[in-house]
Amino acid sequence: DDRKMDTLLTLFGQTEAEAIRQGNVKMQGMVYGNTIISHINRNEYDKIIQKAPGYLDFYILHEQWKLYYQIHMQLITAYNLKGDYKKAAEEAKLMFDRAKARKDKAGMATALYATAITYNVQDRWKEEEDCFRECIRLLWEVSGYDNILTQAYAFLCSSLRAQGQYDKLLQLVPEYEKAIARFEKAAGRTQPEAWGNLYVALMNTYIDTKDYDKAGEYLAKLEGIVNNNISRYELARAKALILQSRGDYRKALAAIDSAAVEVQESEFDLNAVRKIKMEILTRMGRFDEAFTLFDTIIAANDTIKDVEINARFDELRTQYEVEKHIAEKERNLHYFLFTLGICLVLALLLTATFYYNRIIALKNH
């Protein structure tokens, strides 16, 4: 809530002042990074746009490049979510040019990743595909960016699916699997979220190509993942389509009603659900209900046309919920490391730090 955020920002301000007094630029950089992360968690994109440029200058001055790329990425994301694609593209180009001047392949790849996302939110699929392919090529040549590499593959699959390039998508699977294996080896643990992204791509590909038996295999894999963080809407929608293909209309109808519950705030997704439900009702011979639903779809289309950009972001949120989950886990780790650093070098802030630890513990719980 606002009170906790105010407390957190006060703590960051005190820590920044102490870091400056001690000449601890590493801690100062961490403060700025965690400030941006705090605003991300609250969807405060204007705050990110206001603060990030100054922080980026600090990172450049002190050559804290990994933090620079992470925070510049968040600035680009903020512009995208504000709908300012021109500014997002300008920032991505600036980020790429700086990385290229340093011959930093990881930085160049991160900039290409950000550029590809800007193309994605504008439905510029081919340009998105080209960016992600180059991003992936560069990331195979560096280490420490396996999470971004597997996410790039997930986005690339979405781009190929949007273009109907199903053969290319399936050809991508072996190297996608190798990327996940490399990620697991580097992390020392399994990566169910990364596998989940791959299974979603394959499940939806087989649904699109009407191979419902294959789609069912990947749906089962997704449902078998422990701590499954795949969108429940995505799973319910797939289950409804697969059950419909098998003629089990009663269960299909229950599944699609379950999907509708998950997307009440998105008229875009609700209409997609209604279209599937209308087809199921028609196959069941419940024509009056199907026609009523058809009228609802037509009426909703006018609303959707007026809020097309917002609807597009609702779709993105559904597609990339796994990525959000990964990012949240990384943010929690950043908070932990940051708090530990305060305990070690900032004894003057011990009381404030203890309170901050309690906040994070409650959040994690």
What is each residue range found by the language model?
Residues 6-9, 46, 250, 257-260, ...:
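Hydrophobic positions within repeat-based interaction scaffolds
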Residues 13-17, 53-60, 93-100, 133-144, ...:
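Amphipathic alpha-helical segments of tetratricopeptide repeats
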Residues 27, 34, 67, 74, ...:
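"A position-specific structural signal for the A-helix of alpha-solenoid helical repeats
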Residues 197, 201-299:
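Membrane-proximal low-complexity regions enriched in glycine and acidic/polar residues
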